[in-house]
């Protein structure tokens, strides 16, 4: 290509030199030579740049784009065509040391056997007895001992209480000695009612102790017959 351009330029120079005078031909030749030299330099620079870019593109490989805020995938991506095999459940095995400790606990602390509850015999309705304070056959306790507690026992309990068929044991007597009663040295005639109350049995108070009679002692005057 360069050779062809040189030939064309030489032909043009010859034609100009033949047609024009020598002075003008020399100027035109110099001008043409300058233009050719500039074109040649420019083309050489372009070729060098293209070759340099080709060399750089061969050595430099494309790198993947890295995102600074991208988080890694926490699990493995399984393709859709692959079936996941179901794993059998893992059963934990007890170590021999743990088995020995459990056996030692069983020997030290044996399990208690639960005793069955015995069913109590059911008393038929015909044999039930209703507690009646006025009935002397069903009531084994004296009336004057139960009267202080009658206002504390509700009526529903009095109707549901059952007396056993066995004889009721008498309540233990307290060790407190009764109040000494005055002894009359001689027989009396026409004893008034107030003096007769002194000889009654002591009453049981709410505290469970024997209390003496609350009536004051009244002197007894017997009429003297002359």
Swiss-Prot record:
Post-translational modification: There are at least three different forms found in milk, with varying degrees of phosphorylation. These include form 5-P which is phosphorylated at three sites, this form is present in low amounts, form 6-P which is phosphorylated at six sites, and form 7-P which is phosphorylated at seven sites.
Biased composition (Basic and acidic residues): 28-51
Superkingdom, natural source: Eukaryota
Location(s) in or outside the cell: Secreted
Chain intervals for the UniProt region annotation (Disordered): 1-51
Modified residues (Phosphothreonine): 12
Keyword flag Nucleotidyltransferase: no
Protein keywords: Milk protein, Phosphoprotein, Secreted
Predominant location: secreted
GO cellular component: extracellular space
Listed InterPro entries: Casein, Casein_beta
Tissues expressed in: Mammary gland specific. Secreted in milk.
Modified residues (Phosphoserine): 9, 15, 17-18, 25
Family from the record: Belongs to the beta-casein family.
Function: Important role in determination of the surface properties of the casein micelles.
Name the record gives this protein: Beta-casein
Native species: Equus asinus (Donkey)
